[in-house]
Amino acid sequence: ERDVNRVQLIRQMGLIEGQPILNAQEWESVRARGSSVIANWIDEQMKYKAAVIVLIGRETASRPWVRYEIQKAWDARKPLLGIRIHGLSSMGAVDTIGPDPFTQISGFEGRNPGLPIFDPTVSGVLGDIDSKATYQNLVDHLRSWSSQGRVRQA
C-alpha cells in the first residue's frame, strides 16, 4: 500500500507511547481473516487508546478501514487529530497531499467537524518538498501535536 513505509517510519520514531508497531505481515494476517476479524481487531485496539492519530497520506481518505477507525473514535468520543505524511520519503520519493479524511464522519459529510490536521511538510527554496527537513519537523513536533486531538461534543 502506498503509505506503508511512511507509517512504519513514524511508528519507529518511538515518540508516541503505548503505540505497538504492527508490521505489514501482522496486518496481512489480520486482513486475510475477513471483515469481521478486522473490525473486532480495530475495536479491541481502540479500547486502550487515549487518542487516535490519523496519519494522512494521498489515499488515506479512501481507505475503508481508516474511515471505520475514524468513525469509531468519533462515536467513542476519543480525541482525534490528523498528521500529514506525504512529505516523508518512501522508497526515495515524496507524494502529493491527500484529501481530509475527517470530512467523511457521519453527519459531517463534506466538511471537517473541527478536528486538527498538522502538516510537518517543509518545502525547499524551489518549492520542492525537503523530506529530511519534513522528517525532522515531525520529530520536533509529534509529541506536542499528539496531545491536541479534539473530541466529539454531545
Predicted segments, located by residue:
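Conserved beta-strand-loop-alpha-helix hinge of the TIR/SEFIR fold
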Residues: 45-74, 78-89
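Conserved N-terminal substructure of TIR/SEFIR domains
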Residues: 1-48, 139-154
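Contiguous, function-dense segments enriched for cysteine-driven chemistry
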Residues: 15-18, 36, 52-53, 68-72, ...
